[in-house]
Amino acid sequence: VLALDYRWSNEQQFQTTREWAEECFGKHGLPYAIALHAPDPDGDPRNWHAHVMSSYRPMTRVGPNEWEVAEALRTDLDNPRSMQLLRENFARAMTRMSREAGQCERHTALSHAARGLPVEPQQHLGEARTRKARSGEYVAAN
């Protein structure tokens, strides 16, 4: 799941996500699918995000709805360093689109801790507890 800038058009959001996915997966012959998600009607209206699904098994399109699927996985790309590179590449893609959109914001792949920010990690509430919190009910978390 990739957080996107809510001020951008859907085209800009999709373009940023597609360029990132092509750089990280497509150029290695790996398939990917992108879905842009609008914020939940009851949630934060800034929560535009993309879901990206990929595989480490290379695929080549050989016809309409027809793919040649490799037998071997790209295990060389499935490691902690590659996960960090995914984050770094997305930060660069977000920064590039920010400049194109005239915002000139710089995005980073660094965690809050690595940036020296005193922010405690929060617990994921899940759908049921989020619904309770939004309705004004007390939820013992964060």
Predicted regions located by residue number:
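Active-site-flanking beta-strand signature of metal-NTP-handling nucleotidyl enzymes
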Residues: 1-3, 56
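A short, contiguous, amphipathic alpha-helix enriched in charged residues
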Residues: 6-36, 88-89, 93
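"Short basic amphipathic alpha-helical interaction patches in structured regions
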Residues: 13-20, 49-51, 66-68
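Broad gene-expression machinery/nucleic-acid interaction feature
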Residues: 29-31, 47-51
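Single-stranded nucleic-acid nicking/binding segments centered on His-rich, glycine/basic loops
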Residues: 38-48, 55-142
